[in-house]
Design a protein with these regions (language model features):
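A short, structured loop/turn motif at beta-sheet edges
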Residues: 1-3, 30-33, 101-103
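Short, structured beta-strand/loop micro-motifs enriched in basic residues and often containing a Trp
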Residues: 2, 8-22
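Short, surface-exposed beta-strand/loop "edge" segments at domain boundaries and coil↔beta transitions
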Residues: 13-17, 46, 102-104
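Intrinsic-disorder/low-complexity, polar/charged segments enriched in Ser/Thr/Lys/Arg/Asp/Glu/Gln
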Residues: 3, 36-38, 91-93
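Short, compact, well-ordered microdomains
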Residues: 58-104
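Short, flexible N-terminal segments of the mature chain
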Residues: 20-44
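Short, Lys/Arg- and Gly-enriched loop/turn segments at beta-strand edges
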Residues: 44-55
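A structural detector for beta-sheet-dominated domains
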Residues: 7-9, 40, 97-99
Length: 104
């Protein structure tokens, strides 16, 4: 099993949708563009958003176990994926890439 690098590539925010549909929340997303985590195999990295992990964990697990080439050639690098979290008000796009380093 391999480690997987998770990089926050882009963070969007839709204040018009938030104003129209969202109840005020105590803790908004604090992910920063360029932020990097290393998943040690299937384990969620410390400090990584639980909701975002729910969105990307299946892809991380597949990459960690040597899989890839999602959706028949979707990514230029077959050992990678671009996956967004499921927050419709402030989605974050994460670039996932399998590393050569073995998970511990």
């Amino acid at each position: 099993m391999k480690k997987v690098r998770i990089t926050a590539i882009r963070k969007a925010c839709y204040p018009d949708l938030m104003e129209k549909y969202e109840n005020p929340i105590q803790h908004a997303c604090d992910v920063r563009e360029g932020q990097v985590w290393i998943a040690n195999g299937w384990a969620k990295p410390e400090g990584f958003c639980d909701s975002a992990w729910d969105s990307i964990s299946a892809f991380v697990m597949t990459l960690a176990h040597g899989g890839g080439d999602f959706y028949d050639g979707w990514m230029k690098n077959p050992r990678s994926a671009m996956i967004s979290c499921n927050d419709g008000f402030r989605p974050v796009s994460f670039y996932l890439e399998a590393l050569e380093e073995d998970a511990q």
